[in-house]
C-alpha cells in the first residue's frame, strides 16, 4: 500500500465511524427552504458586505474584514481550482441524485477555501445538487451536526433528495488543516493571527486536493452504506 493510498484509507475509516444516520427531516427541510445555489449565495454575501453588513447574527468590523478577504479568495479559487483525475473518476460513479447542503457564513475563513472546491465537484456531476444555507438562520439543524460540541463551519451534509434523510456529513476543514491548528494550539495555547496565516498558507499549498480526497471518501462511504441497505 502506497503512502497516498494509506492516507485515503484512513480518511475513509474515520468518516465511516463519524457519520450519523439519525433522521432530522424537519430541520433539513427548513434549511433547504431558505438555501441558495452557489452563485446566489455569493451574491447575497456580496450585497450584505456592500451594505456594510455581514451574514449571521453578529456584526463586527472583524467579520467585515474577513468577508472582504473571503470575496477575494473565492474569486481566485473559482478560477484556479482544478479537480484531480481521481476525483473526476469517483464523481462519475455517482449515478444517484444527492443533495449537498452546506451550513456556513460569509465571513467564515474555512468556507472561502472549501466552498469553491465543493462547487467544482458538484458541477462535475449533474446528480449533485449543491445548496448553501446560513448557519445562524438554521440553528436547529446546526445543533444536530455539532463538531465536538461546537457549531464549526462549513459543515457539508449529504442528503437523500427524495426523503431528506441525512446520509453523511463532513467539516469544518480537511484533516491536514485540523492537525495544523491542533498542533499550533498545543504549542502556543491559542489560535492567533499567526496560526490563521499558517492555515491559509496550508490551504494555498494543498490546492484543494485533500478536500477532494475526503469528500470522495465520504461519498464512497455513503454509496457503500446505501448498497448494504439494499442487500
Tell what function each PLM region has.
Residues 101-105, 127-141:
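Thiol-based oxidoreductase modules, predominantly thioredoxin-like and allied folds used
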Residues 112-122:
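Typically the conserved alpha-helix immediately C-terminal to a functionally engaged Cys/Sec
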Residues 130, 142-158:
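Positively charged, polar, low-complexity stretches
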Residues 154-169:
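A short, hydrophobic beta-strand/beta-hairpin element that forms part of a small beta-sheet core
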